[in-house]
Amino acid sequence: MKKSILLFFITFLVISCSSDRDYLPEDFWGMKLKRKLTGNEAKDFVDKLHFQNVATEKNEVGFYTGEIGNATIYITYYTDEKTAYQDFRKMTEKISPENSMFVRGTYHNINNKQLYSCMGLGQVHYVFAHQNLLFWISVDPHFSRNFLDEYMKLVMN
């Protein structure tokens, strides 16, 4: 009996530690993942958006499309939670001034998570850190909040 419990516990730990969550699923909220960038391709894409080197070594970008509209999810991986949160603060402070292409920037507390939202380029943008990850979600305005709520459930659970 003790061996069975120990074997179950070890198996559970191995599965839990080895499973990587897919933050860019093939289908999400009625939309299809049309393109996924990883590795150097994702890093180069993020750097080109900023006209300078800003991306960490590990990034992912997912482009979603469906009948309802479009969304893009940018994910940056950090070595620890503290660095992810520091970059969240740094990034949101940099885009907060009304002289940037982003307007109406506001901090919120949604689902017990500090989040920043703003408007720009015809979309609503949400930025938040979770564990060692930094997320930037750009989504069409007419379904942005519902999309965010569902995506946060995916990330937090």
Model regions: which residues?
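Positively charged n-region of N-terminal signal peptides that target proteins for export
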Residues: 1-4
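Short, exposed beta-strand-loop hairpins at the edges of beta-sheets
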Residues: 126-130, 134-144
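A short acidic-to-branched-hydrophobic micro-motif
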Residues: 58-90
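Short Gly/Thr-rich strand-loop-strand
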Residues: 29-52, 81-125, 157
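Short, low-complexity, disordered segments immediately C-terminal to signal peptides
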Residues: 21-31
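C-terminal motif of bacterial Sec signal peptides marking the signal peptidase cleavage site
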Residues: 15-16
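Sec-dependent N-terminal signal peptides
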Residues: 6-8
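Surface-exposed amphipathic alpha-helical segments
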Residues: 138-157
